[in-house]
């Protein structure tokens, strides 16, 4: 047996080149992808600072875990305000109490001009915030820990009261005539999530169950929710507590093949798409962008003019109920990561 | 000199001894990290920042001491992270529920963590299962128990504040006080760390038990053959981890008043990272306690240095992983060079 060696003809390489160009051109997606993202980023207003104050330094230390979409939105808001207010914005985060405390201490060591802190762990932050106060650094608390904020000497708190948010969700579900609600807690032991569920339960006026799933293992969570829906056909509403969990919940609802409505806290691309298509009834939003933006902006106002919104009373960024009517406008903002 | 190796013989004896030290790699790494952050981060060299870095290092280092001893003894403890939380929860809930002086909770907590350590060692000796599996089991069980028991007793996921209870102030003094020496704020954990470090090093290098640790980690069968009580040695090492967890757990409780039940998991790997950067071999039989301190210090400098340098902290874990690999490679290299020389 003789092997014939492949010998390209003279026309082979030009043909290849033409094909490659054709494939490259045809292979360009006219929708989505990085190009679309860059176009959106350009559309979103940025621009330089609009003030003449010196370049202050503001640090934000949160209890967020790594790579959380919600906190990315908070950060974007803060960065936007920082750009406008001629502020150097420093962000750090750690989900563990002692590490978050150390990060706050590190910010104090750096002699920042303002400090934004989340108080998810309440009492644990008392000492270190006392040190910030002693160092003369203005502190504003954001997102969680409204009940501790004033006690620890913060100027104000910007966030959403989770029980109130839960009640708003409950009222909305009652208005929509939901009969039997399944509230899905995806972080066992998160106080805010418990408050959302119990708040909703107090106003829903219907059958109400709480189930726990593992939020860091989405396939597992999806299987758990669909198993629950299959085993109890009387459930007509699933209430999830975050944007990503809503996406998982939607898949589980599809698995279960029944006319179940999904309602959720917080937003995300899938939630907005769901609002549009009708698979999501409503979303309760706490406006994370606003928490970051207002946090930085209020520090600026305080340092510039000694202003404090609400005279130091907690400033609510939610609950804001979003439905199908808002979906079109929201889609654009969610896509650029500011909602 | 029995082995004729020109390369090694050429070197002075002092240098050869230095190269054979397990801490060498981590010492070089620690100096490098310090220099990098001293150059790029202006606040890093301030005295107040040094206090913050030392504190961060001590909260890792307190556990890295017993964990490195355990690794030299040839075993792992994956439950080391959550046991710390268990220690804090136990202490807090016992004191609160029985309205006892906080010292009661502190002592019950010590008994609990030692019991967990003993359980790990006993299971290991009895079942001959790999310690990876045994402690993975205790890790998962404790993670569940921390949450379940706390929720069942306090109704929420965190404990109630014990700050107004009798004995709190003295406990706080012991575990969570701070003294300022010339502008440098030194937290109690730093003293505990240094103390454990001294004791751990002394035990490892100057006592018969220290020889046993090297022996059981190097070759358990050979050690047994020459009369070393292998199972008992390992159990004592697990008790050591329990003790370290108790110290750190009490610190968490008395500095923050309340404890979140879901914390701690993931830290066990940080302790192992500190031990490995410090020159402990993952297969046992080789390593040092002082090295674990350098590992913890590198961790403290890196985690806070990134903040002082105003770098994006998103990259912190990447940096840590790269450090770990580099340290492990350096250790392997140094060890190979040292073994080639005469003993």
Regions found by a protein language model. Give the residues of each.
Chain A
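C-terminal motif of bacterial Sec signal peptides marking the signal peptidase cleavage site
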Residues: 23-27
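Hinge/cleft segment of the Venus flytrap/periplasmic-binding protein
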Residues: 29, 37-54, 203-204, 290-339
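Extracytoplasmic "Venus flytrap"
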Residues: 43-81, 85, 90-102, 119-122, ...
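An alpha-beta-alpha
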Residues: 58-60, 65, 78, 167-212, ...
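Structural motif
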Residues: 88-111, 210-232, 246-248
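Hydrophobic alpha-helical segments within soluble ligand-binding/sensing domains
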Residues: 100, 156-181, 220-222, 267-271, ...
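Hydrophobic alpha-helical
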Residues: 117-133, 200, 214-273
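Flexible loop/hinge segments that line or gate small-molecule binding clefts
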Residues: 123-164, 268-276, 280-281, 329-331
């Amino acid at each position: 047996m003789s092997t014939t060696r492949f010998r390209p003809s003279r026309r082979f390489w030009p043909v290849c080149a033409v094909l490659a160009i054709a494939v490259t051109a045809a292979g360009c997606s006219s929708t989505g992808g990085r190009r679309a993202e860059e176009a959106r980023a350009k559309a979103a207003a940025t621009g330089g600072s609009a003030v003449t104050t010196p370049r202050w330094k503001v640090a934000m230390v949160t209890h967020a875990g790594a790579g959380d979409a919600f906190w990315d939105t908070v950060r974007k808001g803060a960065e936007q305000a920082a750009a406008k207010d001629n502020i150097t914005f420093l962000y750090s985060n750690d989900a563990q109490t002692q590490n978050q405390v150390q990060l706050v201490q590190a910010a104090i060591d750096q002699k920042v001009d303002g400090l934004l802190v989340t108080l998810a762990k309440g009492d644990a932050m008392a000492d270190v915030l006392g040190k910030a106060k002693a160092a003369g650094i203005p502190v504003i608390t954001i997102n969680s820990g409204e009940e501790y904020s004033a006690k620890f000497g913060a100027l104000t708190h910007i966030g959403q009261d989770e029980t109130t948010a839960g009640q708003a969700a409950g009222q909305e579900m009652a208005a929509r005539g939901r009969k039997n609600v399944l509230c899905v807690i995806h972080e066992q032991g998160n106080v805010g999530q418990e408050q959302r569920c119990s708040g909703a339960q107090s106003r829903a006026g219907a059958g109400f169950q709480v189930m726990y799933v593992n939020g860091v293992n989405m396939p597992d969570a999806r299987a758990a929710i669909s198993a629950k829906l299959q085993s109890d056909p009387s459930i007509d509403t699933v209430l999830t507590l975050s944007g990503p969990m809503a996406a998982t919940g939607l898949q589980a609802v599809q698995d279960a093949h029944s006319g179940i409505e999904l309602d959720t806290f917080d937003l995300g691309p899938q939630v907005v798409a769901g609002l549009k298509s009708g698979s999501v009834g409503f979303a309760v939003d706490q406006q994370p962008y606003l928490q970051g933006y207002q946090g930085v902006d209020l520090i600026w106002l305080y340092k510039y003019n000694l202003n404090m919104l609400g005279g130091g009373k907690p400033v609510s960024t939610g609950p804001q109920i979003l439905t199908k009517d808002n979906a079109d406008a929201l889609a654009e903002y969610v896509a650029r990561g500011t909602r | 000199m029995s082995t004729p190796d020109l390369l090694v013989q050429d070197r002075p004896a002092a240098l050869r001894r230095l190269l054979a030290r397990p801490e060498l790699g981590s010492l070089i790494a620690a100096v490098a990290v310090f220099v990098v952050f001293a150059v790029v981060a202006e606040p890093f060299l301030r005295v107040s920042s040094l206090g913050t870095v030392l504190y961060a290092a001590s909260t890792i280092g307190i556990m890295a001491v017993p964990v490195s001893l355990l690794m030299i003894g040839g075993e792992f403890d994956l439950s080391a992270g959550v046991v710390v939380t268990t220690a804090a929860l136990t202490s807090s809930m016992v004191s609160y529920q029985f309205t006892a002086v906080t010292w009661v909770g502190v002592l019950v907590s010590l008994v609990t963590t030692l019991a967990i350590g003993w359980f790990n060692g006993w299971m290991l000796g009895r079942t001959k299962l790999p310690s990876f599996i045994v402690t993975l089991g205790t890790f998962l069980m404790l993670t569940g128990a921390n949450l379940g028991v706390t929720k069942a007793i306090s109704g929420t996921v965190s404990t109630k504040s014990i700050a107004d209870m009798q004995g709190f102030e003295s406990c706080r003094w012991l575990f969570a006080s701070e003294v300022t020496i010339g502008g440098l704020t030194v937290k109690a954990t730093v003293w505990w760390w240094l103390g454990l470090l001294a004791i751990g090093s002394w035990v490892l290098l100057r006592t018969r038990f220290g020889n046993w640790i090297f022996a059981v980690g190097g070759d358990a069968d050979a050690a047994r053959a020459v009369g070393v009580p292998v199972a008992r040695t390992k159990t004592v090492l697990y008790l050591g981890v329990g003790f370290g967890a108790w110290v750190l757990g009490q610190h968490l409780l008395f500095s923050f008043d309340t404890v979140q039940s879901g914390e701690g998991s993931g830290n066990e790997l940080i302790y192992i990272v500190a031990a490995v950067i410090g020159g402990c071999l993952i297969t046992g039989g080789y390593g040092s306690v002082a090295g674990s301190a350098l590992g913890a210090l590198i961790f403290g400098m890196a985690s806070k240095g990134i903040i002082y340098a105003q770098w994006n902290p998103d990259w912190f874990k990447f940096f840590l992983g790269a450090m770990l690999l580099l340290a492990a490679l350096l250790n392997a290299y140094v060890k190979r060079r040292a073994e080639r020389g005469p003993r």
